[in-house]
């Protein structure tokens, strides 16, 4: 074996899913000493129908048995609650829409889990993420690359990883398409070969999100207004809505009036009729008002500039200013933009085309081609003509 594939002790995060299972198998096939770790990150109501880690552990243990590796059950629930869930609640209480999976990767899977693996004498860790790591021969820096399967790429969720973390990390399935991963799992007889991909936030599972959040954040009803200031109904609490949201607004059947349609025509918004869907455009925390607009192309849903804070750069320092691409939400196509300013504290992006429903609390992640440069948490954008000239969440 060459140095890259010489035998190493590698600890794999086995989730019970097919991606981490194939990850462990591929590394074992390369001759490495592979140890599986099942991470338990949530304990509250974990025996419920929505989110049971016990079922996932049974699947992970069955995989380990087929592959022929050891598996250990490790509880990181306290770390998760302190480092991830507490921040998740603070952000929702402030009216923003956080992405806990990004923080979970940075604080749990590639910090607490990595530390545990190193105590076991591991040289590397591996997970079933669809991303790639490459060491730049010219700079010596480790680069985070998109996964080869564009429909499964998860580099967006990994953009906060640093050089120390990437230097110890392997993403074997990032070099494959999902169909290939399923085929390998079928061929070697993995018991979870056809297991459905996990969706949503692990501690919420398949339950209604609003019901879950209401266990921790009290409802605070207030008015729902359109862009003309007309009251359309009542919301249950601003924390329970996100910018761009269309479903669950409680104003189904409300039609635009003549004055509303004339206002839409005056601002050049074409094709808006009385039955067009409504979207959340602004959350005014001071007045507890939820502002909604009609039509997907409403100006209140369009932004060409954004400011992000708490930026993290994969290389350890901010990239050079200039042309690049960015995503303001997962699964969004790369959008051409210019990095106008960048520090560890924050950055400003100017987009070539208007971006839809740029949401404070979500992450803006930057790319140069297939290389993920890092990113930050969206703080504000330049949505025009909002009431009072305030930001979309304020």
Swiss-Prot record:
GO molecular-function term, one example from the UniProt record: ATP binding
Renumbered to this chain, region (Interaction with tRNA) spans 152-154, 329-330
Name the chemical reaction catalysed here: S-sulfanyl-L-cysteinyl-[protein] + uridine(34) in tRNA + AH2 + ATP = 2-thiouridine(34) in tRNA + L-cysteinyl-[protein] + A + AMP + diphosphate + H(+)
Could you tell me which residues belong to the region Interaction with target base in tRNA? 99-101
Please indicate which superkingdom the organism of origin belongs to: Bacteria
Instruction: Tell me which InterPro entries the record gives.
Output: MnmA-like, MnmA-like_C, MnmA-like_central, MnmA-like_central_sf, Rossmann-like_a/b/a_fold
**A GO cellular component annotation in the UniProt record:** cytoplasm
Q: Which UniProt keywords apply?
A: ATP-binding, Cytoplasm, Disulfide bond, Nucleotide-binding, RNA-binding, Transferase, tRNA processing, tRNA-binding
Q: Which EC class is this protein assigned?
A: transferase
| EC code(s) of this entry | 2.8.1.13
Where in or outside the cell? Cytoplasm
Q: Quick one: which residues bind ATP?
A: 13-20, 39, 128
- Record bears the keyword Ligase: no
Q: Where is this site: Interaction with tRNA?
A: 129, 362
Example of a GO biological process term: tRNA wobble position uridine thiolation
Tell me the protein family, please.
Answer: Belongs to the MnmA/TRMU family.
Concerning NCBIfam families, the annotation shows:
PRK00143.1, trmU
Function, as annotated, reads: Catalyzes the 2-thiolation of uridine at the wobble position (U34) of tRNA, leading to the formation of s(2)U34.
Q: What is the name of the protein in this document?
A: tRNA-specific 2-thiouridylase MnmA
* Naturally occurring in which organism (per UniProt): Polaromonas naphthalenivorans (strain CJ2)
